[in-house]
Amino acid sequence: MQHGLLKPSFVQRIDFIDEQIAELEAEVEKQNAPMEEAVSLLAEIPGFDRTTAWSVIAEIGVDMSQFPSADDLASWAGVCPGNNESAGKRLSGKTRKGSRWLRQKLCQSAWCASRCKNSYFTAYFQRIAAHRGKKRAIVAVSHSLLVVCYYMLQRKCHFQDLGVNYFDQLNHEKLTRYFVKRLTRLGHKVTLQPCPAAA
């Protein structure tokens, strides 16, 4: 039998599989109709789409009262580093065992979120990756994404991005004090006057 004769058969199989996928997705939509609000909310998160939202909800549900806090949810899911510390030093950064499927979906979303322009998650990823490497940064972003899911589902609120400049704004006063102190030690008298553009 010639290979050319096999091609139509493969095309038919692919078409059949595509039809089955479409039917399954339609069925998932139907089953998730009562949770449509929650799915739509989570789909607003950078790195998420509706399929990811379905996957997360399938694992954690929509009732966050089952978890005392966002950290409890993250611990249950296995997306927060172990807290083994001695004299203030972390002994282990390994994540705890949790839902492998959920952790996988969150890590995929974390990679996507870390590449979104003007997003808090991009800044957060870069901040952690610079000191602890990309793998730990992805776990940190995954944890942050799940915490966001927790509060959005708990409060039924829309996503609000803190922005790519969040950490700069957070540390603005701290950095100002630091540089004033350094300049003073170097023998300079420092008088601060905000620039009109920064005021």
Regions found by a protein language model. Give the residues of each.
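A detector of single, family-specific signature residues
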Residues: 1-199
